[in-house]
Regions:
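Alpha-helical structural elements
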Residues: 1, 91-92, 121
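Basic, low-complexity segments
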Residues: 1-27
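Generic detector of bulky aromatic hydrophobic side chains
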Residues: 9, 77, 111-113
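Short, Lys/Arg-enriched phosphate-binding patches
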Residues: 17-107
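Helix-turn-helix/homeodomain-like alpha-helical modules used for DNA recognition
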Residues: 106-136
């Protein structure tokens, strides 16, 4: 049985269906990064950058996924921000969160997430608004 067609028939509006599917996909992606961030955070805490470099090598060679040390550090920062009170919205993708990783002000970050949560914006427009909001 094609569950996507079955689920689609439950919805009258195509936009609601697409929105719901996107939210489920975002939830899976963000949940993965939270769990992965937890592992990386502990690895970094216990072994420092040597452990992170070994993790990068392991992922690239054994799991056959291209990942850089920079991406690993972004995921750790994402996890740390959650630990310090950053809210999670499944209405936006991880790419939106990556725009906010350069900031440390949780109140500012949460206000940006709430803005994106209320008003769906494309990523480029979101980045513009974040920069303008921070500067003025």
């Amino acid at each position: 049985m094609n569950y996507e067609n079955y689920i689609h028939n439950l919805f009258v509006d195509d936009e609601i269906f697409k929105y719901s599917i996107n939210e489920i996909e975002n939830q899976h992606e963000i949940s993965f990064y939270i769990r992965f961030g937890s592992v990386l955070y502990n690895l970094n805490h216990d072994y420092g950058s040597i452990g992170l470099r070994k993790m990068v090598d392991y992922i690239n060679s054994e799991i056959n996924q291209d990942i850089t040390l920079k991406e690993i550090k972004q995921i750790i920062k994402f996890f740390k921000l959650i630990c310090h009170g950053m809210i999670i919205s499944y209405k936006i993708t991880f790419e939106y969160y990556k725009c906010l990783l350069k900031y440390d002000d949780i109140v500012f970050i949460n206000s940006c997430i709430e803005l994106a949560d209320r008003n769906p914006l494309d990523l480029e427009r979101f980045e513009e608004i974040v920069i303008n909001k921070k500067n003025g």
